[in-house]
Amino acid sequence: MSQHKNSVGLLVSAVGVVFGDIGTSPLYAMKETFAGHHPIMVSPENIFGVLSLVFWTVMLLVTVKYVILIMRADNHGEGGSLALLALVTELTRGRRVHYPLMLLGVIAAALFYGDSMITPAISVLSAVEGLEVVTPDLKAYVVPITALVLTGLFAIQSRGTALVGRLFGPVMCLWFVTLALLGIANIVRAPEVLEAISPTFAIEFVIRHPLMSFYALGTVVLAVTGGEALYTDMGHFGRFPIRLGWFSLVLPALLLNYFGQGALLIADPAAIQNPFFRMGPEWMVMPMVALATLATVIASQAVISGAFSVARQAIQLGLLPRMTIVHTSGEEAGQIYVPFTNWTLYFAVMALVIGFQSSSNLAAAYGIAVTGTMMIDTILVSFVMALLWRWNMALVIVVAGTLLLVDFAYFAANIIKVAQGGWFPLFIGFISFTVLTTWRRGRALVRKQLKKQAVPLDVVLRALGPNVSRARGTAVFLTAATDGVPPALLHNLKHNQTVHQRVVLATVTTAETPYVPDSERVHMTDIGDGFHRLIIRYGFMQTPDIPAALTLCKQFGHEFNMMSTSFFLSRETFVPSLNPGMALWRERLFTFMTLNATRATTFFKIPTDRVVELGTQLEI
């Protein structure tokens, strides 16, 4: 009985978090298809064609591609572009495709940030725009109310969302039930719309109106925005609850609502100005606006939480500098708050709301990031099919090729909307890609320079003569290299002529798996003469904690008393140079990011009163 309750609870929670983005798409998808930047005449023929496109887009891109196929490609239970990237880079290590695929994964992560800025803006705007259905006089209040709602949402992030998070599931369940009931109520008026399930209507629409249908693809794809979240959030809820929630509630509710909007437009073509809020009687408009606003806030929360998670993954995978990561829940390790990400998103979202003014204007900006990410996911998962699942190559080509062809059609239909707003996610994607690759390249150059300057440990051990005194206690030297002597140790020997009785050379590494169990966290080897090499491993979904890791060294016969342990860190100062490696402007960007990174003591949770920092200068 308790297991059944847990399953139901997990299902309700999954509905509240996973399906928020795709669940709020009915607010604007049909409206933008018929009344957007490339309007389509509201006629039964066109309505049937668009409904058929919507149905098969949802079935192919979400149900078949993500729910059935890509959700099988988990990285030890975790999903998402960076988890998939880590899995694929591990599978292709040593192959020619390794580096290009890694770049593709970084591009997907960069596009995600463009998407995560647009989603809160377009979702909440589209909900509040329901006020215009009540009376056009309320139009002037749409942007201020949207800004107020979003400001409140971003302001509470630092306090965590555990308390209000319990309401997400029930509210979203109510939302999907409402979608279904509104759809059924309108389908009854024109039940013939259900015939649009047949793909012949979509095919005929494309053949008869090739240009119109091409434009329609650019807005029909709005019906699947958020589909990738089903894969991204797999680590939080598991594959089964997400699939169960999709097939039992979300998919039927979405399709019923889209077909209900189609039935409404057949009966009343004038309803195209905002078909969603005209699906019910007039007295329902205000309650629907309130419920829609709650649903879009929940959808936005899911995107914001996803942005925090991706930021942590990027830091751990060496794509971003250290940032402050705050755990907002003592019970749920996945609930984190990243201040820099939060406020960067907030100001970008505010700029979008104020700059674009309406969900219709923002719709043009929405599709590029989503379709670009979906296309990259298909490419990455094709290598999983071939190398991990060992599918026949002909089958891989047929399945991946078909999905890629569909993805590309939607991407092409959105790329033509660059001038109408599509430039924004491309701009954000370019900035994000530049930052991610600059940091990764910069750290690689730093490691190369340190290795070039490194002194072999055996040389130092031989040089420890009678003139070098041994201080009591333990010294832990943090170093990125797993061989050689850290610069901080060399500086200590040079200036103080002393080393501690026990010296630990500690290196923190990130595995290409989401989690590393405590049993595999540390590995300590005795080098001799009181020196030890310590490797500390974390997964890309974990936050490092060095004092906690040191307590695990008991298995190697070592105990650490924090009051007699000193931590020595190298504080690197970088000097941009004309050496080959990176353009001068990128070297300056890397230096700027390094200066503004969270201090190692904070990031690694090292007691500040036990830290000694020694400076070192490097040319990159």
From Swiss-Prot:
Reaction catalysis annotation: K(+)(in) + H(+)(in) = K(+)(out) + H(+)(out)
MF (Gene Ontology): potassium ion transmembrane transporter activity; symporter activity
Main location: membrane
Membrane topology, record value: Multi-pass membrane protein
Membrane-spanning parts: 8-28, 50-70, 102-122, 136-156, 168-188, 211-231, 246-266, 284-304, 336-356, 368-388, 393-413, 415-435
Source organism, top-level taxon: Bacteria
Example of a GO cellular component annotation carried by this entry: plasma membrane
InterPro entries given in the database record: K+_transporter, K_trans_C, K_trans_N, Kup
Location(s) in or outside the cell: Cell inner membrane
The entry's keywords: Cell inner membrane, Cell membrane, Ion transport, Membrane, Potassium, Potassium transport, Symport, Transmembrane, Transmembrane helix, Transport
Function: Transport of potassium into the cell. Likely operates as a K(+):H(+) symporter.
HAMAP family, per the entry: Kup
UniProt record similarity statement: Belongs to the HAK/KUP transporter (TC 2.A.72) family.
Name of this protein: Probable potassium transport system protein Kup
Record organism: Rhodopseudomonas palustris (strain HaA2)
Gene expressing this chain: kup
